[in-house]
C-alpha cells in the first residue's frame, strides 16, 4: 500500500479531497481556439480540433452579474434533479472578494429563485494523450448537443450530438471530435462573430482502447463518489469551505453571451 492510499485512509489531508482537480477544457468564444485552464494558468491548444472520449457527465449553473461585482455558481452534480449548493462571490471596497454559500436546491428550484443562472454541461473527457480533462459546454454550444431532429429540420442545422446515437450505442464507445463552429449574433446594433463547439462522431473504439476507457470511467466515478461521501459524512453544518468546490471561479465569457 502506497503513502497516498494510507493518507486517504488516515484522513490527515481530507480537506483537499473535496475537489477533483483536473484541467478545464473550454472553447474561447470570440477567437475560436480551445484552451486548458488549471490553477489560473491557461494553455492554448494549437490544433483546430480536439479529439477524445466522453467519460462522465455532470452539470452546473452560474451567472456573472454587475460586471463581475456579483458572481453565482453552483456545485457540480450528476443531474439537474440533484440538490446543488449555490455559491456567491461579491466584490467589496478595494476589490476584496467575499465568498458565501447562500442557498441549496435542485436546478429547477434555484433557477426559479435566481433566473439569471445559466446551465452548463460538464463532461469528464479523455484526450488522445490519455489526459483526463473537464470539458465545459455552455451557451450556443449546448444546442449542438441536444438539438432534436425536428429542431434541426426547422433550423437547417445538424441533429444534436446526443441524438446521433442509436438505442444500443454508448457515447463512450466512440471517439468525439470537438471543432470550433463559427456563427453570428446581434449584440445591440452590431452583428458579431462568435464560436461554439461542434461535436463530430468519430470512429468506434477497438477492444484494447475500450478496456482502457472503461478503467478511466471507473476511476472518475470512484473519485467523484468518494468526494460526495466525504461531504455527506461531514453533515450540512460542516460542509467544506466554498473554495474547494469543483469549479474555477466563473469568468465573464462563461455567461455574457449565453442565450
At which residue positions do the language-model features occur?
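OB-fold ssDNA-binding interfaces and closely related basic DNA-contact patches used
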Residues: 1-132, 187-190, 202-204, 255-259
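Polar/charged alpha-helical tracts
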Residues: 4-8, 85, 108, 112, ...
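Generic serine detector
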Residues: 7-10, 75, 79, 140-143, ...
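Sequence-level detector for tyrosine residue identity
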Residues: 18, 33, 61-64, 114, ...
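Long, highly charged low-complexity segments enriched in Glu/Asp and Lys/Arg with interspersed Ser/Thr
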Residues: 65, 71-73, 188-251, 259
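Extended serine/threonine-enriched, polar tracts that run as long, contiguous segments within proteins
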Residues: 119-204
Amino acid at each position: 500500500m502506497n503513502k497516498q492510499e494510507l493518507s486517504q485512509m488516515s484522513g490527515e489531508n481530507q480537506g483537499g479531497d473535496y475537489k477533483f482537480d483536473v484541467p478545464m477544457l473550454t472553447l474561447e468564444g470570440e477567437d475560436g481556439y480551445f484552451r486548458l485552464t488549471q490553477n489560473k494558468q491557461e494553455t492554448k491548444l494549437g490544433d483546430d480540433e480536439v479529439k477524445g472520449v466522453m467519460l462522465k457527465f455532470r452539470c452546473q449553473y452560474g451567472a456573472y452579474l454587475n460586471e463581475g461585482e456579483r458572481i453565482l455558481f453552483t456545485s457540480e452534480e450528476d443531474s439537474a434533479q440533484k440538490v446543488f449548493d449555490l455559491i456567491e462571490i461579491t466584490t467589496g471596497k478595494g476589490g476584496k472578494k467575499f465568498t458565501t454559500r447562500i442557498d441549496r436546491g435542485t436546478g429547477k428550484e434555484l433557477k426559479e429563485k435566481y433566473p439569471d443562472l445559466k446551465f452548463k454541461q460538464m463532461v469528464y473527457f479523455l484526450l488522445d494523450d490519455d489526459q483526463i480533462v473537464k470539458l465545459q459546454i455552455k451557451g450556443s454550444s449546448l444546442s449542438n448537443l441536444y438539438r432534436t431532429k425536428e429542431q434541426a429540420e426547422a433550423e437547417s442545422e445538424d441533429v444534436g450530438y446526443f441524438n446521433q446515437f442509436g438505442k444500443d450505442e454508448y457515447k463512450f464507445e466512440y471517439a468525439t471530435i470537438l471543432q470550433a463552429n463559427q456563427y453570428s449574433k446581434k449584440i445591440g446594433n452590431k452583428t458579431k462573430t462568435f464560436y461554439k463547439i461542434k461535436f463530430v462522431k468519430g470512429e468506434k473504439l477497438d477492444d484494447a482502447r475500450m478496456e482502457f476507457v472503461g478503467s478511466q470511467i471507473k476511476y472518475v466515478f470512484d473519485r467523484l463518489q468518494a468526494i460526495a461521501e466525504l461531504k455527506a459524512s461531514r453533515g450540512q453544518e460542516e460542509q467544506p469551505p466554498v473554495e474547494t468546490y469543483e469549479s474555477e471561479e466563473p469568468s465573464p465569457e462563461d455567461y455574457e453571451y449565453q442565450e
